[in-house]
Regions:
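Major-groove recognition helix of helix-turn-helix-like DNA-binding domains
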Residues: 211-224
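Short, amphipathic alpha-helical "recognition" segments used to contact nucleic acids or chromatin
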Residues: 180-199, 218
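Short, Lys/Arg-enriched anionic-surface-contact patches
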Residues: 164-187
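Short Fe-S-cluster ligation motifs
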Residues: 144-159
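Short functional micro-motifs and their immediate structural scaffolds
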Residues: 79, 121-124
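Short alpha-helical "recognition helix" segments of helix-turn-helix
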Residues: 202-206
Length: 227
C-alpha cells in the first residue's frame, strides 16, 4: 500500500472525502486486497455508498483496521476537528504525540502551531477553554507550517469570534454556573475589542448566554452596549 493510498483510505474513514468520490477511487485501485484483508476489501468494493448506515459501518471497520498500524492519532483526526478537554481521555491520546512548536502571542492566547513527534503532521490549534472546553485542530501542510514560522498565520482561527463560530459547528457552549464569571466577562470584552460594532445578540449567541446577560457582561467591563 502506498502512502497516497493510505492517506485516501484514512480520509474516507474519518469522513473527509465524499462517498462517491471514494468509491470511484477505490474501484480503480489495485493491490489493496492483501493489506486490507479479503473481507474488508470486498465490503469496500461492493457496498452501496448511497446508504448512510452502510457507509458509517464501513468507515468504522476501516478505521479499526488502519488504527492497528498507527503510532499516533493524527490520521484518524478530521482535517478540521474538535477534541473535548477531559471526558473519555481522547485529548490525552491525541496530545501524547502532538507537541507545541509556536505560540501566536500578541493577545491571541488560544492560537498555537503544533507538530506530531511520530508522523510529523502539523496542526494549527485553537485552545478554547472559556466557552466550549475544546481544542479545535486544523490539519495543515508543511508549507503552511513554514509560513506560520515566518509569522504568516492562516485566518481561520485568527480572531476569537472566528474560533467561537467554529465551536458552534461542533457543539453547544458549556453552561456556566456563574452568569458573571470572569471567563464570560473576558470573552465579551475580547469580542467587542476586536469588533466594536458587534451586537449584544451576536455576543449572546457566541457565548451561549441570554442577551440580557450579554449586556451585563459588557457593562461589567465598562463597555456601553449598542442600542
Amino acid at each position: 500500500m502506498t502512502a497516497e493510498q493510505l492517506s485516501k483510505l484514512w480520509a474516507f474513514a474519518r469522513g473527509d472525502i465524499a462517498e462517491t468520490t471514494f468509491e470511484n477511487w477505490f474501484l480503480a485501485q489495485d493491490e489493496l486486497e492483501a493489506p486490507l484483508g479479503e473481507d474488508l476489501h470486498w465490503s469496500l468494493a461492493s457496498a452501496d455508498y448511497r446508504d448512510r448506515d452502510v457507509v458509517w459501518k464501513l468507515r468504522k471497520s476501516l478505521a479499526q483496521h488502519l488504527r492497528a498500524h498507527e503510532k499516533c492519532e493524527c490520521a484518524s483526526i478530521r482535517d478540521l476537528a474538535a477534541i473535548p478537554m477531559g471526558g473519555d481521555g481522547l485529548d490525552e491520546r491525541v496530545f501524547a504525540t502532538i507537541e507545541n512548536v509556536r505560540d501566536h502571542g500578541g493577545g491571541l492566547w488560544w492560537l498555537h502551531l503544533s507538530k506530531c513527534s511520530e508522523c510529523g503532521q502539523h496542526w494549527m490549534i485553537a485552545q478554547e477553554e472559556r466557552i466550549f472546553d475544546e481544542y479545535f485542530l486544523r490539519r495543515i501542510s508543511k508549507g503552511a507550517a513554514e509560513g506560520i514560522l515566518s509569522n504568516t498565520w492562516p485566518d481561520e482561527f485568527i480572531t476569537y469570534e472566528r474560533v467561537l463560530n467554529i465551536g458552534h459547528t461542533f457543539a453547544t457552549p458549556c453552561v456556566s454556573m456563574d452568569a458573571m464569571s470572569g471567563s464570560l466577562i473576558w470573552s465579551a470584552e475580547d469580542l467587542r475589542k476586536v469588533r466594536p460594532e458587534i451586537t449584544v445578540d451576536e455576543i449572546a449567541r457566541l457565548l451561549g448566554v441570554t442577551p440580557k446577560n450579554a449586556k451585563r457582561l459588557l457593562q461589567a467591563n465598562g463597555r456601553q452596549p449598542p442600542r
